[in-house]
Amino acid sequence: MAYQLYRNTTLGNSLQESLDELIQTQQITPQLALQVLLQFDKAINTALANRVRNRVNFKGSLNTYRFCDNVWTFVLNDVEFREVTDLVKVDKVKIVACDGKNTGNAAE
């Protein structure tokens, strides 16, 4: 099973809403919707690992951190994100980072 972090993105939420609508109108079964979501999990993890090449630097004050079940969670305050010419400042950011070395086992 691949990480399901990206289901809570705009793309993931739109997919889930569309699948829910198809289930309600009985055009697909809940089992098929689950298979679609599992395929989405695999595809988005693979695409982000292999296709994204942009880099962003960020700096902020660490508020809290946690490591549980090979998942790091960081909460940062007063964060600055810098790309080549852009600067974005935000009050608070939560970063969830999963062990990429274990995704081979998780993606089956």
Swiss-Prot record:
What Gene3D superfamilies has UniProt attached to this entry? Transcription factor IIA (TFIIA), beta-barrel domain, Transcription factor IIA gamma subunit, alpha-helical domain
Q: A single GO BP annotation from the record?
A: transcription initiation at RNA polymerase II promoter
The UniProt keyword set, sorted, is: Nucleus, Transcription, Transcription regulation
Please tell me whether the keyword Nucleus is annotated for this protein: yes
Q: Name one GO cellular component term.
A: transcription factor TFIIA complex
Q: Which InterPro entries match?
A: TFIIA_a-hlx, TFIIA_b-brl, TFIIA_gsu, TFIIA_gsu_C, TFIIA_gsu_N
Q: Name where it's found.
A: Nucleus
Question: Subunit comment for this entry?
Answer: TFIIA is a heterodimer of the large unprocessed subunit 1 and a small subunit gamma. It was originally believed to be a heterotrimer of an alpha, a beta and a gamma subunit. Interacts with NCOA6 general coactivator. TFIIA forms a complex with TBP.
By sequence similarity, the record places it as follows: Belongs to the TFIIA subunit 2 family.
Q: What does this protein do?
A: TFIIA is a component of the transcription machinery of RNA polymerase II and plays an important role in transcriptional activation. TFIIA in a complex with TBP mediates transcriptional activity.
- The protein's name is Transcription initiation factor IIA subunit 2
The organism named in the record is Oncorhynchus mykiss (Rainbow trout)
Q: Source gene?
A: gtf2a2
